[in-house]
C-alpha cells in the first residue's frame, strides 16, 4: 500500500487503489474513509507547500470513489438556533463544562473548521475591529510512517487558496468568548508553551499550555451533549434532547 512509497513517488492511482482496498477488502464505512482522506489530504497539501510534490494526488479521489461505489453521503444536520442556544447556555452555566464554552462558542459562531479554530493565535484576531484572520490550519497526525520516532504531533498547514485564507467577522458572543478565554488564562496564569512550525501563542490551550486537538474536543462534546440531554430530561420528561 501507500505506506511503503515516498511522497514524491505517490500518484493518483496509488491513492485510488488504497481507497478501493479500504472499501472492498477492509469493508470500512464511507465515513471512516472520509476521515482517513481528511488527514491524508492535509498531509499531502503540506508536501505541496514544501515543494516535495507539485500537485496533491488525493484531489477528487474520494469523490470518484463515492461515485464508483454508489456511496450514500450521510447528511449531517446542523443545529437549529434553539439547539445552539441550549447548548451554549448549558456550557456557560455548567460548573463542570464552562471551561469549554469559549472554543465551542467560536466554532458555532464562525463556522470555522476544527483545525482552523484550534490553530488561531491571539495575533489572528482583532477584538477592536471584530475580525478573525483565518490563514492556516493546525493538523495533528502520526509521523511514524515518515521515519520519525516522535509519533503523533502537530504541524501547521498554510493554504494558498482564497477559500482557505479569509477574514471572518465576529458576532457579539464570539468576541465575548475570546475575552472570557483571555480572562481565564490570565486568572490561572496560563501561557501557550508550544511552538509549531514557527507558530505560537495559540488561543485555545490545555492546562499544560499545549494546543487543543480534535480528539480531545470530540470526547468533550460527546460528554457535554450527554450531560446536557440528561439535565433537560430531568427538568421535563417530554423535552426533546439536543441530538
Each predicted region: which residue ranges?
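N-terminal core-binding DNA-recognition domain of tyrosine site-specific recombinases/integrases
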Residues: 1-50, 95-98, 211-217, 236-243
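Conserved tyrosine-mediated DNA breakage-rejoining catalytic core shared by Y-recombinases
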Residues: 60-66, 83, 119-194, 198-199
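Generic recognition of well-ordered alpha-helical segments
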Residues: 17, 38, 42, 89, ...
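Short, basic (Lys/Arg/His-rich) helix/loop patches that form interaction surfaces
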Residues: 89-100, 110, 168, 184-194, ...
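Basic, Lys/Arg- and aromatic-enriched nucleic-acid-binding interface segment
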Residues: 30, 34-38, 49, 53-55, ...
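Arg/Lys-rich amphipathic alpha helix in sigma70-family domain 2
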Residues: 45-54, 180-183
